[in-house]
Each structure stands twice: as C-alpha cells, then as structure tokens.
Amino acid sequence: MNSLPRPDIGPFADTPEKRWVGVSFGAAAVGYDGVAALQREVGESLLAGIRHLGPPPARMLDLGAGTGHFSGLLVAAFPTAECLALDIAEGMLRFLRSHRPGADGMGLVVGDAEALPLADESVDLIFSNMAFQWCERLDRAISECCRVLRPGGRLAFSTFGEATLAELRMAWRAVDGYTHVNAFATRRSVEQELRAQGFTKIRLDARTLRRGYPSVLALMKELKALGARNLTRNRPRHLLSRHTLERVSEAYGRLPGMASAVTASFEVLTALVEK
C-alpha cells in the first residue's frame, strides 16, 4: 500500500520518540474505537462547545485525528468546510481512509503537531481531542496552532491534566524507582502557554472522570490498546513480570478506597480559544 502524502511545506519532526508514538498508535488503530469510550465522551463535549461558536469555518483541521471518528462529526457539523485530518500515526490514517464514510473528501496528512505542515494563517478552526498530551513540548504545539490559524480563528482542544492516573502512579512508586506514568500538563501551565502565544479569549475548564476496572492488569491492557505509551526518560526498559504485576496490584489495593475495586482517575482539560 502506498504511503499517505506528506506535504513538503513545513518539516516533519522525526525523532526516535515521535517515531515510537506514531508506530504505537498506528498499531492500535484497528481496536482503538472499541476501547476509546472516555475519548469519545470528552470529544463529544468539546465538539458541542464549538458548534455555535463564531461563523462556520471555511477550512478546519482535526489535529490528532486518529481513526477519524471526530473528523466525520466535524464534516457533519460544518458540511461546507474543507476538512484536513492530520495524525502522526500513518496507521491511523490508513484505517480512516478505508473505514470512514466520506474519507475521500478529506485531506489526510501524516504530520506532527509540533511542526504542522500547513501554511501560516491557513485554517479557521483547529479541533484536537486527546492528542496534545503526546507532544514532547506543549508550547511548540500551541505555537504551531497559533501560526496556522487565521485571525479570528478558533482552537478547541482537550488533553489530560496532571492528576490523570494518579492512583497508578502512586502504586508504582511503592514498587520501584522507575517512572511508569507520563507527566501531564497542569491547568496553569496550559493557560500560561495559551497567553504566551497571544490568545486572549480563553475558556479553560478542568474536570476529573473516574473509570472502574476489574483489575490493574485490565487497566494496563486498555491503556496499551489505546496506543498509550510511557514516554518518560526514566521508564523501565524491561518487560513486566508476573511478580511485579502482583506487587503493583497489591500496592493499588492498599490505596484509599481501592480494597474492593480498581478505579482510575483521568483529569481532563478542555480549552476553547480564539486568535
């Protein structure tokens, strides 16, 4: 199968970490929609917030489009707009192209949120659901969004906040000295980055969603099925042993309120901003 085109305007930031992210999410494409209930819930709320926010866009970007679930909903919400679906994972866009009705009418682009292959002031609306947490530097991603937005353009995004997977983080700390959970942005740091890029009309909200799992292993398997990977420098480089899994499960069970059930917290930050 031929590769999807990479426009030659703007660089694709090709680093080992980014290649790893792209491969991980690409491999998760086939089963992603079956385990992405939280992502859909957050994205639907985000989409509802922009339906009546300003005039309809002429050109819009689904940044971190994944399997294209929200690309299709964006097209339905704004049928006269040109839609670009961009993702760092070529495997995701292959899935989108072959499984999403209307994909032929979208522009599919393999690209990096921190080096968008788009011209300055070329987009009216950027929608990004649960993608920014995988960026190496959030400031570069926000800067790129500001660059490609036209004056008056809107950016709507969601990302995980610092309290995400706090329980899993604490359980692992009781087991070893490695970093097993990614560090996520604080609400304050996100707002500071938006203001630093010149965004003045900012609506930034935070909420915590909690999900129950039959076991710690089930939680880990869901994270893996979503393509989520540990990007920290101090991550373990060895396979998870049964003994270690038992230890982290025991540590999780000792956390307050976890004796009879495994619950995971996901802090979600959502932003609606205008350039």
Curated annotation (Swiss-Prot):
InterPro entries in the cross-refs: BioC, Malonyl-ACP_OMT, Methyltransf_11, SAM-dependent_MTases_sf
Example GO BP: biotin biosynthetic process
Leading EC class: transferase
SUPFAM superfamilies, alphabetized: S-adenosyl-L-methionine-dependent methyltransferases
A GO MF label: S-adenosylmethionine-dependent methyltransferase activity
Superkingdom, natural source: Bacteria
Function in brief: Converts the free carboxyl group of a malonyl-thioester to its methyl ester by transfer of a methyl group from S-adenosyl-L-methionine (SAM). It allows to synthesize pimeloyl-ACP via the fatty acid synthetic pathway.
Family named by the database record: Belongs to the methyltransferase superfamily.
Protein name: Malonyl-[acyl-carrier protein] O-methyltransferase
